[in-house]
Swiss-Prot record:
Any one GO molecular-function label of the UniProt entry: zinc ion binding
Biased composition (Basic and acidic residues): 565-608
Presence of keyword Zinc: yes
Organismal lineage: Eukaryota, Fungi, Dikarya, Ascomycota, Pezizomycotina
Swiss-Prot/TrEMBL GO biological process terms: positive regulation of transcription by RNA polymerase II
Post-translational modification as stated in the protein's UniProt record: Activated by C-terminal proteolytic cleavage by signaling protease (probably palB/RIM13) at neutral to alkaline ambient pH.
UniProt name for this protein: pH-response transcription factor pacC/RIM101
Protein family: Belongs to the pacC/RIM101 family.
Disordered: region residues: 1-40, 353-388, 400-532, 565-621
Subunit and interaction comment: Binds to DNA.
Amino acid sequence: MSPPAPDAQPSSGSSSDNSNADSKSTTPPPPSSTTSTTSAAAISAAVVPDDNLTCRWNACNQKFPNPETLYDHICERHVGRKSTNNLNLTCQWNSCRTTTVKRDHITSHIRVHVPLKPHKCEFCGKSFKRPQDLKKHVKTHADDSVLVRPSQDNHNQGGMNYRPHLNKTPSYYDHNGQMRTQYQHHQPAHPNAYYAPQPSTNYGLYFNQPPLNNHQRTEHLGYGAPPGGYDRKRAFDMVDDFFSSAKRREIDPSSYSQIGRSLLPLHGTLSIPSGPMPATEQHYVPQPQHAGIAHAGPAPTQNPLAQQYYLPMPPNARTQKDLVQIDNLLGQMQDTIYENANHATAGVQIHHGHDHYSGYRSSQSPPIAQRGSPGGMPVGPDGYHQPVSAATMASPLTAMSSTGTPAVTPPSSAVSYTSGHSPSPSAPAMSPQSRHSSTSGSVMYPSLPTSLPAVSQGFGQSTTTTLGPSFESNERRRYSGGMLQRARAAPPRSTDNHNHNHNHGASTPKAPVSPALASPSSEVSDVSEATREREEQYDRWLENMRVIESLREYVRGRLERREYVEEQENEHQGQGEAARKERDGNPMDVDARSPRSPAREQPGRPREGSSLYPILRMPGD
């Protein structure tokens, strides 16, 4: 009954085919035993009915054995070619009447009418008529990373199972329409992730777009400018102008005001990395894992779609001599900014940050901290507070920003990090009371006013630029901020009012007054305005320190990697330009020369500006 039904179907089909062959004798009988082992063309020919293999171009009505033959017939017979003067660009399949401008377009359009699907997907085996249809379909596989469900063979490869496709490496189409191959089996890829190549270190400055990964660390000086080429070139020119001004002594390294004005155009332009160097330590916080998918392989270090733009070396920082000179000038500017830290950070509340990269320091500076943390306790990567001791806590005079920039501590070696000057719970000269006050004061402490000359001297804080406190003990303790603030809060309110009225005068801030006697609106406005000014001043100082450290790190990195032009090569490159300048009387020479000095000097004697520029010899000298 039901079993012989399939056998009867081919017989009826063959009888009908025989009748058609007797009438027209044009269509051969279909193959009697077509199986899945034949080619795709044979499969399609066995599945496609005879009505779909009939040419419907005008009144042709010719039948063909397979879709390939029908397609070739339409292209050669009805479409024609320009070389044979029979090119037809209008589709006449039934009532289509689609007109194109090229032969390739009409031949691609004909695939819509012909049941020909030569483009097969490697992943699922589905066939398509046109290559653009296959390309759109393959992108769906690229979105789900061609991963099978976790329930299928999880015990084989730990959940990272790719579908086997005829022993070929899985591939996908990227967003640019190009075929990409996946990683090898010994490098399982992260799901739903693309991996960008590491940035090259053979160039000078490179510009990048803001990355998606927040833990990126770059070895070069990057610019977080918008994608526009003008903004990247403008930032590059500003850095070069700063190097030029520093080399020509247009900026006084000992003047904080001049340094601040010269660094103001660079604020917000340089991208300060916030993670460790790739060569020292790799930190990556994985995303929440999905069920059945194992995360492994290298972590992505950068936005996959971020483009990198490389520019040549700055003209004013090409040679080794230029880099050494700029590094020395930047060091002097950094010392000047350090010395002005007491005035810039006065009255600004700075707490220990929650960044778990606090163990990394790029320069001689205390551990990382940031301003504005409510509790002042270090927070681990899991979001919980970690145990802390008095030796690891940061005081307000040793705080830093969240990007690793030192806040107040000078770069001098007057106070060592590992010597007996550093505080620790087991210090012999520390009593339990002083130890408790230094520990609690470094965690929670009020903000200090802008200027406290009498109080700071009375309580033992030093007014020198080294910011080293003086106590009755022999130890130079660096936790003076907590001690000073705790001692300031100890006297009663009446004593503070008496001292305010008789001793301090207008320079001392007002003591706390009863809320019933004070005007809340005026006090809140005055405090908010003063706090805003102090915070803006601190932000400017902090940004200056960030820019200086970034520039100095960039210069030192180039010196370590020997990314500079040799002196002899630089002389040969600038020999023609120097000859032209000498002939024209050096119109662009800005070196400081004495008006009595001759225009041309002796060949054997160096110029006064030899420390800034190499000596260029003329061929006739």
